[in-house]
Amino acid sequence: MNPSYKPSDVESAAQAQWSAADAYRVTEDASRKKYYACSMLPYPSGKLHMGHVRNYTINDMLTRYLRMSGYNVLMPMGWDAFGLPAENAALKNGVPPAKWTYENIDYMRGQLQAMGLAIDWSREIATCDPSYYKWNQWLFLKMLEKGIAYRKTQVVNWDPVDQTVLANEQVIDGKGWRTGATVERREIPGYYLKISDYAEELLEHTQHKLPGWPERVKLMQENWIGKSEGVRFAFTHDIQDASGRLIQDGRMYVFTTRADTIMGVTFCAVAPEHPLAAHAATLDPKVAAFIEECKSGGTTEAELATQEKKGVPTGLTVKHPITEEQVPVWVGNYVLINYGDGAVMGVPAHDERDFAFANKYGIEIIQVVLVDDEPHFDYHRWQDWYGDKQRGVTINSDNFSGMTHKEAVAAVAHALAQKGLGEMQTTWRLRDWGVSRQRYWGTPIPIIHCDEHGAVPVPEKDLPVVLPTDCVPDGSGNPLAKHEGFHAGVVCPVCGKPARRETDTMDTFVDSSWYFMRYCDPKNEQAMVAEGADYWMPMDQYIGGIEHAILHLLYARFWTKVMRDLGLVKVDEPFSKLLTQGMVLNHIYYHRDEKGGKNYHPPLEVTPTLDAQGRIVGGTTADGTKIEYGGVGKMGKSERNGVDPQDLIEKYGADTARLYTMFTAPPEATLEWNDAAVEGSYRFLRRVWNFGVAQADVAPVAFGGQAFGKAAQALRREVHTVLRQVDYDYQRMQYNTVVSGAMKLLNALEGFKPDGSAGDAAALREGLGILLRCLYPATPHITHQLWQHLGYDKELGDLLDAPWPVVDVAALEQDEIELMLQVNGKLRGALRVPAGASKAEIEALALSCDDFVKFAEGAPAKRVIVVPGRLVNVVI
């Protein structure tokens, strides 16, 4: 046993043993309790970052603890391998995305193995492998059969640089999330999945079937699903198109949750793509120009909420459904064609957006709701009470005046229904999922286009439709459209005539919507999932970042419900518990160039400048460059403030990297990087090693039957007290306090002073064995080696499956306890009494102790109050 702690030697030896024993391969076992713990699969970008290290160490600690506790535990790993970054890297380096991706996978797999993670690599998947994405295609065809998947033309966000459709969430301030290019609105055909059909169930299950999820995430999902109760009704009109037909049968429909304000409508606004807007554009060049301008904006609610609200009058009017007065129609850049009917009623007096719009363009404002005790209505300054539907009562509303919000909504809905113009309706913010992407590196959509029969599904026997792996993107659109081999020999399944394949590929969120089920049965060539999923699902613990709170998690839940309805799985929800780990942060430093741009510097290259309070205010580099301080932010490439896990492992070892990320903050909290604390974690492990080395020459003593002296009893009391807390912390996944508990154990062991009793050696050996097991899930290499070197494996087996230590309740009992001593309610000292002392015995000891005699100064005691286990108060 090397007297010095050499992490590389320790870790390579442990990993070699685990590899030789195939230690982490797991099989289904109905006789054992199962536990499925999984981290969100990584994108193979080339290197792990510290966020990965933290995420997977959390998973690994849970896995190892539960395995020692008797569970059959699955911790798998795979690669979210499709996506645009691979195409961009290929474009930059002139290599096929497949080559770039698989090289990255090989490198990152090695990094994960160097971390010592308890991953069952026999279940590894890569979403770019045809054996995986075949089942994406298969389920897509099943969805087509069931009407869940369908094709339509719709206005989408188009990134003109990447030449692809962006999801709403990928549009930030009107620009593409990756390229920064101004997003355009385009109408293109594509495939959609009817997630909206599952909206009610998704909402209900969010509220009632996810007790192990953070409330924050559930609220985000509820808001995204967005259930609204309101009234859908029509403004009628007699506007005809060029052929003399009534546009939309003479009805312009809107939906509102504020039907109580219908008498305050002074205008309506339609989306730039609405049929009335298109008609107006043929009559007025200003309208046509405005519609063209709107095409450069995004189609997201988030963007519309922040951009300037603009519009133009169309010159058209529609008839108010109650008053029958003519209402002017505007085209508004804030109205989305994909939401509702692409038209909204304008009630400036009681909607803040409409209020600003009306004041900007001089549109009439009519107050129709009054809130008692509020100031006079100001037509030029918005006040929050204008939109208060809970306290408001209708005014200036003819037959609907004097009603509360609920009363007025019901009355208006009834009146509109009698006219045949409207009805109560539930609407959803959730929109069907557009899965078509104009990209190469993704799952091919299994459709064949025939001149005679149109879009025809690929027969199941011909799956998978294999993606060519020899494409090197050149930046000009989708390479699949130009790849002759992809279309060679393709014929229509209906008529047998030459045809072409669909060149759109699937959104990569499809790949990540069910991979966790494929882990359960990854080699099955005959079925998407089988018995393995029946055993392992639902997943017991899912771990990933809060950034996936909406899309990935919602899509995975939807996908699970579709698979359930197709009889593939038996669960309603895929993830029983969810942990969203905090981000890893680091300092940000930069200097500005001549144009004011920021040039970032790695923190290790900067000597910080501190103010009088010790706060960082700037810094300098080795060449004297003055550096500005940008605060603390998420580690990332753009700010150059990341820490390479490989560098950390090479310098300190994987156990130190793991220990530091677990000790510094609770799993769900952000972790602020501190190089000095990393060094501290390493020093602690060196102490553990040195203590183990010191015990290596001591002959193992079998535990049991020894008489323990006071020193040994005190040690065992401390050890089992800490063990009880550590076990509790493991159960609630508070790993930072698990590590601090291990540090307390080491302090107790190092501070143990034997008093010569027969049980001294046994107590010390027991304590060290408990320390190694408590620390093992966090730092498996060093503890594994010490466990073997010290002979614990001969008694309890390999540390992998050693039984989790049980708290000895008897060891927690104390001969004496310490009580606070008070005189007239003021703390005057401490009183040690036998643990089982009676009230009378405690009173006698209190009255005779030195502290009481000193402060009483001869005064007799009038009363003695004893609070068991806490204090004794003598009243004089």
UniProtKB/Swiss-Prot annotation:
GO terms under biological process: leucyl-tRNA aminoacylation
NAD as UniProt keyword: no
Sorted UniProt keywords: Aminoacyl-tRNA synthetase, ATP-binding, Cytoplasm, Ligase, Nucleotide-binding, Protein biosynthesis
Compartments, as annotated in UniProt: Cytoplasm
Enzyme Commission number(s) from the entry: 6.1.1.4
Statement: the UniProt record of this protein carries the keyword Cytoplasm: yes
GO cellular component, one term: cytosol
Ligand binding (ATP): 637
GO molecular function: aminoacyl-tRNA deacylase activity; ATP binding; leucine-tRNA ligase activity
Reactions catalysed: tRNA(Leu) + L-leucine + ATP = L-leucyl-tRNA(Leu) + AMP + diphosphate
Main location: cytoplasm
'HIGH' region, short sequence motif: residues: 42-52
Chain location of the short sequence motif 'KMSKS' region per the record: 634-638
Family designation: Belongs to the class-I aminoacyl-tRNA synthetase family.
PANTHER family reported for this sequence: LEUCINE--TRNA LIGASE, MITOCHONDRIAL, LEUCYL-TRNA SYNTHETASE
Name assigned to this protein: Leucine--tRNA ligase
Species per Swiss-Prot/TrEMBL record: Variovorax paradoxus (strain S110)
Gene: leuS
